[in-house]
UniProtKB/Swiss-Prot annotation:
Disulfide bonds join 109-187. The gene is PTGER2. It comes from Homo sapiens. PANTHER family: G-PROTEIN COUPLED RECEPTOR FAMILY 1 MEMBER, PROSTAGLANDIN E2 RECEPTOR EP2 SUBTYPE. This is Prostaglandin E2 receptor EP2 subtype. The chain crosses the membrane at residues 24-47, 66-91, 112-132, 152-176, 199-223, 263-286, 300-323.
Amino acid sequence: MGNASNDSQSEDCETRQWLPPGESPAISSVMFSAGVLGNLIALALLARRWRGDVGCSAGRRSSLSLFHVLVTELVFTDLLGTCLISPVVLASYARNQTLVALAPESRACTYFAFAMTFFSLATMLMLFAMALERYLSIGHPYFYQRRVSRSGGLAVLPVIYAVSLLFCSLPLLDYGQYVQYCPGTWCFIRHGRTAYLQLYATLLLLLIVSVLACNFSVILNLIRMHRRSRRSRCGPSLGSGRGGPGARRRGERVSMAEETDHLILLAIMTITFAVCSLPFTIFAYMNETSSRKEKWDLQALRFLSINSIIDPWVFAILRPPVLRLMRSVLCCRISLRTQDATQTSCSTQSDASKQADL
């Protein structure tokens, strides 16, 4: 009886024509406004950096790195997804009709579900590309310098869009199916009837794990860079002029600071996506016979949508001064802990060299 009740409730949600009484567009309106505003602010900040980079001399033109190119593509993807998805929901609330009834042959429902799966996958692929770029930059610098270029980053976006388009078009080819969910303001992959939803969720999980693995590798390499720079302080400081060891050490410190800033930004975006994807992942792996609540399904979708709202605000808030503050807080204890050890090591080496001279 319980399974039959769940099946009938699911079928009612899939074919419902009118929204239930009391449904409010307030949350959807706030999410749409926050998403558009945040992405526009982030794009404006990135555009200013692009203009500043164009105005720089050739020797300083590396200030806009490949990482910032990928961030620009991520923000553009989030803005495009917000502008193409949210208006459909607002139109449904305005007409008090479900997505199935909003257009003939459930076209609005199919469009919404396809766009939702497409932009969610594209966002995760962009985060993976950013994490892979950091991994190659830190872990394999020679390969990175020879094979990876800033102009090559411009090709990442169309490649990601092509992959996402092919994967998300499978339900249109009868592998999987897009259906409407309660209260009728959103559509997604049919739950439990095919393996496509589990395949989609598994792909997102694999991408999240890959991003976390790349970030962990970057953290280990940054720790090694910190230890090397700490040991180099014990060496002679001769040739502090241009091109000397002093200049090299300053360049290493600047490079490490920039990499740490990029890692902080990428780590926060990755954690955000992982947290926002968790309810959807639980929703995807739940059994069809379990008692799923309408509100839980809707909250899972909203959590997945929130990621495209948070990402640009993270970039807009974490400006270089804020990143420097966070870096100083994160590194303060390590520096204080290692300062005494560094001085002790340096004095020990100095005493040993004096005894050798005697």
